[in-house]
Amino acid sequence: MDRMEEFLPRVRAYLVGRDWTDVPCMRGRTFEVAPLAQGEYNLNYRISAGGLRLVFRVNIGTQIQRRDQIVYEYRALKLLERSGAAPRPYFVDDSRRRFETGILIMEFLPGAPLDYRRDSAAAAALFARIHQTEVP
């Protein structure tokens, strides 16, 4: 069994076992969960209910040696929220009660994998927009 499949029941149990009253977009919903993608440092699952589509990210490592890696990602996404160039973060849990590392729930942005030859100009424009975002 691969890591994505191994964590899938835990993701489902987490979604069912938590009271989501503090996260308005998730309140009172029953979610479908499907593996989305695995990176070097995160496992990503698409969660959906009706027209709502989100990403449930399980942190599994860090390249910058941070114990609070998922909180760091959440805060970075919060800072970029106004840019419109990054997914909106909705929830972070770094308590480590259900997962050895933290989890993050964020907006799902549809698209295709980056093709450097085809997408370099668009990627450069996106990075320029991100770098122009004012932060407090």
Predicted segment positions?
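ATP-binding pocket architecture of kinase catalytic cores
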Residues: 34-136
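Juxta-kinase regulatory segment immediately upstream of eukaryotic protein kinase catalytic domains
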Residues: 1-32
